[in-house]
């Protein structure tokens, strides 16, 4: 079974299959389009993945600059977002390298991307968190961070001390926090176990199959600075 980071680099179809079952009530779309004015905006999106966040606003934005560190996953995003080819410019960049960009945007958004860098960086985590905050705030009038508040959890909580530190820093730096439900829905528990386990690991797979879950609860945090 591939690990989470291997999935991003080499298994875009598996990742896309996962996110296509996520948020079956469409709560992220409802939130982003009720609270953010996207019309004719220049948007920078970091960690575009297969385009799941982008689909929520791309039809309204004037231009999207899409960044990811994996050409493999960008290729999948290009397929998923082929209706908006003229509106999107793709670039390969690691989130650590945001400071190298000269671009300015009206809105910056990232979804389930910066958190991975925070979790990976054990030596300079505090500095990495502040870099992500400072470099995005200086490049856009509005900044939106979307990160996990727990998958297969009974209530919303940061999954681990590292992400908790990240989320507290966002609030301390002027971001407002919002929590939504982004539950997964599958046709049967075998499918749920296969797909969720392929990304989150055997422990989640076994729990889903043992409890015969077809709907997997998930909470998502949205932090907005403007």
Q: Which ranges hold each PLM region?
A:
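Class I SAM-dependent methyltransferase SAM/SAH-binding core
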Residues: 44, 50-97
